[in-house]
Amino acid sequence: MTNADPHELQKFSDLAHRWWDPNAEFKPLHDLNPVRLGWIDAHAHLAGKRALDIGCGGGILSESMAGLGAQVKGIDLSTEALGVADLHSLESGISVDYEAIAAEAIAAREPGTYDVVTCMEMLEHVPSPGDVVAACATLVKPGGWVFFSTLNRNLKSYLFAVIGAEYIAQMLPKGTHDYARFIRPSELAGFVRATDLHIVEIKGITYHPIGKRFALSNDTDINYLVACRRGA
């Protein structure tokens, strides 16, 4: 059984044609991308590395990593989003290999294959996030890096990420997030501890409304990033 929620898949498939419009529904991802890309590259030094982007959607992060010299494969279960990703790759001239396959399925097929595995803004959209974390641990080479980003579960994150971002500021479409699926850092750390990954760094992401920009911070109350490494 695929670890996916049909409602979540349909939600993002319906918006697939908007992935690369920097002023549409995925504007927050476009604004966030330079921050997360720089953080990933600072740890993993992407040039020349083989990278897998799980839950790649329309390919915003996948293309960015390829642009830094990584050999990138992007996977997603939304064929509509992957169609947009393929088309944009042709238009940009940045080569990325896209495939419609679940993380668990590719982990069974390609264990220990990738230097870098990214799973960004995806765990909070699947029924069993721990299974995805385990798949990431299987996919990465010994000594390789795995990166996660997700949303903390607390009153502050509900007020800012759901009420504020979706209903007041309308930065995201209503219904983008299901608060019950937000993941506390301690819960994600538990998933990681069940694998042979170890956590290297946890960073928060803060949004500055005046400058309309995201920045790394030590505040993990809302959005946060986790860098993990597999034992050599």
Swiss-Prot record:
Pathway of action: Cofactor biosynthesis; ubiquinone biosynthesis
Signal peptide start and end residues: none
Transmembrane spans: none
GO molecular function, one term: 2-polyprenyl-6-hydroxyphenol methylase activity
InterPro entries hit by this protein: SAM-dependent_MTases_sf, UbiG_MeTrfase
HAMAP family, alphabetized: UbiG
Protein name per UniProt: Ubiquinone biosynthesis O-methyltransferase
Species of origin: Burkholderia cenocepacia (strain ATCC BAA-245 / DSM 16553 / LMG 16656 / NCTC 13227 / J2315 / CF5610)
